[in-house]
């Protein structure tokens, strides 16, 4: 069946286009709390609800609309987590200036392969740009979330992707500072905590240095 302009809006105006902030929010749905990893996606319904609320998928439709017909919920959740883990690994790699893991790259490439296909379509005025979907709705949603990070790499801005230097945080963020030296996802929280920790360490070290040293034991006479 030929596509028509009324059925497919131009991709650049598509209301499900994601931003880099959306991608990072997706990556940060797994985080450290009190030293333990906490996954906001405990079930597929959790993941699907997040995708719908974020606008990756049509609002007004429940998680069932995102559930692939050929897999169960556990497999669908595993797919979401696998793409998220792969994108996080890529973010960590570029943040630390190291090559990304080959398996992670393969996972991301599988995700973006499901991106909608851009097409020329008939319109009342002659022709316009439309799109058609390649994968199932979940594939398409994950492709949309992967796309902004891939775009930053292609645009040569991957060196601004950071992982928070706070070992109890590790959020992924984009460094928009003028000098490109930002280390914390948020200076008011992680940055200040790090400064406070360094201050406590200096005070402790200073107090240790000022402790009186025990007197050396008196020399005892040795027998002839």
Where are these regions (language model features)?
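Short linker/helix segments within small regulatory modules
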Residues: 175-182
């Amino acid at each position: 069946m030929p596509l028509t302009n009324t059925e497919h809006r131009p991709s650049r105006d598509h209301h499900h286009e994601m931003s880099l902030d959306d991608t990072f929010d997706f990556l940060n749905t797994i985080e450290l709390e009190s030293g333990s990893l906490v996954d906001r996606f405990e079930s597929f319904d959790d993941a699907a609800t997040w995708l719908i609320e974020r606008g990756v998928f049509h609002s007004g439709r429940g998680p069932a609309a995102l559930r692939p017909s050929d897999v169960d919920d556990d497999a669908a959740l595993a797919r979401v987590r696998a793409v998220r883990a792969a994108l996080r690994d890529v973010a960590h790699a570029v943040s630390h200036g190291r090559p990304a893991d080959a398996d992670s790259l393969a996972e991301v490439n599988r995700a973006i392969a499901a991106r909608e296909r851009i097409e020329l379509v008939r319109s009342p005025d002659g022709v316009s740009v439309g799109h058609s979907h390649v994968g199932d709705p979940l594939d398409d949603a994950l492709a949309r979330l992967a796309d902004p990070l891939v775009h930053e790499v292609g645009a040569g801005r991957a060196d601004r992707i950071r992982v928070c230097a706070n070992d109890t945080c590790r959020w992924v963020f984009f460094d928009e500072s003028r000098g490109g030296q930002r280390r914390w996802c948020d200076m008011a929280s992680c940055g200040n905590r790090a400064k406070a920790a360094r201050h406590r360490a200096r005070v402790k070290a200073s107090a240790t240095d000022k402790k009186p040293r025990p007197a050396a034991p008196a020399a005892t006479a040795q027998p002839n």
